[in-house]
C-alpha cells in the first residue's frame, strides 16, 4: 500500500482572494495516478486556499474565552469543514474522471483530537475500502478536540500521514509539494 500526500499548494491557488482550484495541476495529478495504477493507495491532500484562510479567520484551535467566542468558533469550524469538503469533492471527481474509484474519507467523521493532535482514529472503514479496491481520499480538516477550552482543532494532512503510517504500515509514502527536488532526509 502507498500513501500519497498532495500538498494544498499544488492543487489550489494560494495567492487567490477566494478558494480556487488549480484545475490544470489537479487534472495532471489525477492522470498521473491513473497511469501509475497502484494496486492499493490512500490519497491525502492539504486544504490550501480552501481551508487555511478560514481556519485563521475563525481562530480554530485557539483557546475559547467566552460564549460569544465559542459561537464564532463553532460557526467557523462548520464553514471551514464545508470549504475543505468542496475541495475534496473536486479531487474525488477528478480521480473518478480518470477511472479511479475514489471515496471521500472526512477526518471529522473518524478522528478526535486533543490540543490539536490526533488522540484517536477509527481507521477500520479506510481498511475496508482498501480491501474492496477503493481509493480512500482524506484531507486536512477541522475535528472535535477533547480539550474543553479549545473544542475544535485543525488536523493537517501531515498529521494524517504520520498517524496512518504508524497504524497502517504502508510500503511507501510519497509527498507531492510545490517545491522542486527530492528529500533524502527529514528537512
Specify the residue positions occupied by each region the protein language model found.
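Acidic, metal-binding active-site segment of PIN/NYN-like and related structure-specific nucleases
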Residues: 164-187
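Glycine-rich loop at the start of a catalytic domain that most often binds anionic cofactors/ligands
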Residues: 48-64
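Alpha-helix C-terminal capping segments
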Residues: 35-36, 94-98, 163-171
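Ligand-binding beta-strand-loop-alpha-helix segment within the catalytic cores
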Residues: 59-142
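N-terminal glycine-/serine-/threonine-rich phosphate-binding loop
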Residues: 1-42
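Active-site glycine-rich loop that binds ribose-phosphate moieties when present
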Residues: 27-30, 118-124, 152-164
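Short beta-strand segments
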Residues: 3-7, 44-45, 105-106, 137-139, ...
Amino acid at each position: 500500500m502507498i500513501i500519497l500526500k498532495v500538498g494544498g499548494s499544488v492543487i489550489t491557488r494560494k495567492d487567490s482572494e477566494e478558494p480556487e482550484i488549480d484545475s490544470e495541476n489537479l487534472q495532471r495529478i489525477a492522470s498521473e495516478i491513473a497511469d501509475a495504477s497502484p494496486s492499493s493507495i490512500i490519497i491525502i491532500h492539504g486544504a490550501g486556499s480552501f481551508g487555511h484562510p478560514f481556519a485563521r479567520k475563525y481562530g480554530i484551535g485557539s483557546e475559547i474565552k467566552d460564549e460569544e467566542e465559542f459561537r464564532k468558533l463553532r460557526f467557523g469550524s462548520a464553514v471551514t469543514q464545508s470549504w475543505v469538503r468542496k475541495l475534496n469533492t473536486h479531487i474525488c471527481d477528478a480521480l473518478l474522471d480518470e477511472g479511479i474509484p475514489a471515496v471521500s474519507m472526512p477526518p471529522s467523521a473518524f478522528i478526535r483530537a486533543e490540543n490539536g493532535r490526533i488522540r484517536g482514529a477509527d481507521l477500520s472503514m479506510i481498511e475496508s475500502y482498501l480491501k474492496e479496491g477503493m481509493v480512500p481520499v482524506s484531507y486536512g480538516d477541522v475535528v472535535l478536540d477533547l480539550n474543553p477550552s479549545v473544542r475544535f482543532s485543525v488536523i493537517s494532512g501531515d498529521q494524517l500521514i504520520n498517524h496512518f503510517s504508524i497504524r497502517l504500515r504502508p510500503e511507501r509514502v510519497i509527498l507531492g509539494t510545490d517545491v522542486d527536488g527530492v528529500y533524502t532526509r527529514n528537512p
